[in-house]
Amino acid sequence: MEARVLGTMIEKRITVPDSYPLTINSLVNGCNQMNNRAPVTSLTEAEVASAVERLRDRGFTGLFTGAATRVPKYAERFGERLGLQAGEIALLCELMLRGAQMPGELRSRAERMHTFADLAEVEATLKAMSELTPPLVVQLPREAGARAAKWQHMLFGGEVPVGEAATLPPSKADRESALAERVTSLEAKVADLEDALRALRIQLGETPSP
């Protein structure tokens, strides 16, 4: 839910700045609108308000105050908080609003918020965000018949669907654990070979070395 709320706030800030910051009511309407959303939701004011508070706790949103403001309005601080560039924000926004997408889809849909020079720039931006610690996005396995693999955001505890986690880059601890297991396995094989060689020498009447 936080992803939909934050994505909506980012979208409205960039595409309709005259209507920004947003009241809870306008934010509910933005979250539940039919276009540029997948899936379409029916969030309530209470649900959206709760999500906004959780985002405030993380420093991603803040209460806007002004002389002409009678109803509380909220603004997002996501890019500022994480030190993101315009292209990164646009891609993450689309991923939060529509879910996993291919680079070509992202380039076309993010055009209203940021213009990418070409598809290669989109892919490079996604790759850079996937290499952060922790990663902000992850590339999913390419589906059968698909032109390209999809990318998914990893914000708010985002999880890779079952069977797709293998595409996540292994952590240092995972790599060290795998290396230790391989060393142990090789040591066991060497010990077995030494035992077999010792037994063969005994059969041949040779004195085995200690």
Residue ranges and their predicted role:
Residues 66-105, 149-178:
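Short, amphipathic alpha-helical interaction segments positioned at domain boundaries
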Residues 109-112, 140-155, 195-210:
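Helical coiled-coil/dimerization "stalks"
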Residues 82, 172-208:
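Amphipathic alpha-helical oligomerization/assembly segments
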Residues 16-40, 100-116:
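Short acidic, hydrophobic short linear motifs in intrinsically disordered regions
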Residues 1-21, 83-100, 126, 131-132:
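Positively charged, polyanion-binding regions of nucleic-acid-associated proteins
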Residues 1-7, 14-18, 52-83:
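Intrinsically disordered, low-complexity serine/threonine- and proline-rich regulatory segments
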Residues 78, 84-123, 133-137, 142-143:
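Extended, charged alpha-helical interaction scaffolds
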Residues 49-66, 126-143:
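A short, conserved structural fragment
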